[in-house]
C-alpha cells in the first residue's frame, strides 16, 4: 500500500557470521490472515549477520493488499468478516450482497377474461449480473463493476387461441427491462365472440 511499512522486526543484533535467530513465517501468516498477499519474502533462510558495523542489514518482505471478487456465485455478506481467520478485521461492506450483483428482470404476460379457460400467466426472466472487487485489507469496494448488459428486450409470445373468445392482442411481450426497472406486465384481455 504505497510502500508503507506494515510491521518491523525491530533491531536485531548479533555477532558477525552468526545465524540471525528470526523467522518471518508467523508475521507473514498473521498478515495473510488479515487479507494481505505475499509478494516476496526477502529474508533468506539461514541468514547471518554481516561483518560491516557501518552498514545496517535490511531484509524486506513485500506484501500487497489482497482482493476478492464479488459475484452472484460468491456474494459478500455485509457485516460479516471478509477474512475468516480475522474475525475482528474488515467486514463485508453494504452493497456486496447477492442483490447488488444479480438482479432478475421479469416479463409477465397476464391473461384475463376467458373464465376458467383463461391461460395462466406467462413469465419470462432475465438475470442482470456484475462482478465487483473488494479490498480484503480495507474492506472497501475498489471496483463496483458494470452490469453484463444495460437493458434486455423480451421476445413476443403468440396469444393462445381459445374457442368462443377473441383477444385484444395477437401477440404480447417485447418489453424492456433494466437493472433499475426490473418488472414489466402486459395484459391480454379476452372477450367472448
Question: Predicted segment positions?
Answer:
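Residue-level detector of beta-strand face positions
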Residues: 30, 108-110, 132, 158-159
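Intrinsically disordered, low-complexity segments
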Residues: 6-7, 142, 190
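Acidic/polar residues at beta-strand termini and the immediately following turn/coil
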Residues: 1-2, 21, 113, 133-141, ...
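Conserved "repeat-terminator" motif of extracellular CCP/Sushi domains
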Residues: 1, 49-112, 169-193
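Surface-exposed interfaces of beta-sheet-rich extracellular modules
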Residues: 20-54, 69-77, 144-177
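Residues that cap or initiate secondary-structure elements
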Residues: 67-69, 115, 132-134, 153, ...
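Short, ordered, surface-exposed loop/turn motifs in non-cytosolic proteins
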Residues: 2-11, 115-136
Amino acid at each position: 500500500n504505497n510502500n508503507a511499512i506494515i510491521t518491523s522486526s525491530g533491531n536485531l543484533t548479533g555477532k558477525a557470521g552468526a545465524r540471525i535467530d528470526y523467522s518471518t513465517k508467523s508475521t507473514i501468516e498473521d498478515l495473510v490472515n488479515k487479507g494481505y498477499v505475499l509478494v516476496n519474502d526477502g529474508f533468506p533462510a539461514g541468514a547471518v549477520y554481516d561483518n560491516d558495523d557501518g552498514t545496517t542489514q535490511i531484509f524486506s518482505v513485500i506484501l500487497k493488499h489482497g482482493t476478492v471478487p464479488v459475484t452472484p456465485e460468491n456474494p459478500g455478506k455485509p457485516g460479516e468478516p471478509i477474512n475468516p481467520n480475522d474475525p475482528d478485521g474488515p467486514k463485508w461492506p453494504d452493497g456486496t450482497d447477492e442483490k447488488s450483483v444479480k438482479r432478475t428482470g421479469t416479463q409477465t404476460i397476464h391473461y384475463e377474461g376467458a373464465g376458467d379457460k383463461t391461460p395462466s400467466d406467462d413469465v419470462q426472466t432475465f438475470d442482470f449480473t456484475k462482478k465487483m472487487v473488494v479490498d480484503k485489507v480495507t474492506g472497501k469496494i475498489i471496483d463496483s463493476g458494470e452490469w453484463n448488459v444495460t437493458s434486455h428486450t423480451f421476445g413476443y409470445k403468440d396469444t393462445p387461441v381459445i374457442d368462443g373468445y377473441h383477444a385484444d392482442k395477437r401477440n404480447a411481450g417485447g418489453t424492456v427491462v433494466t437493472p433499475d426497472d426490473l418488472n414489466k406486465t402486459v395484459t391480454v384481455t379476452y372477450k367472448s365472440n
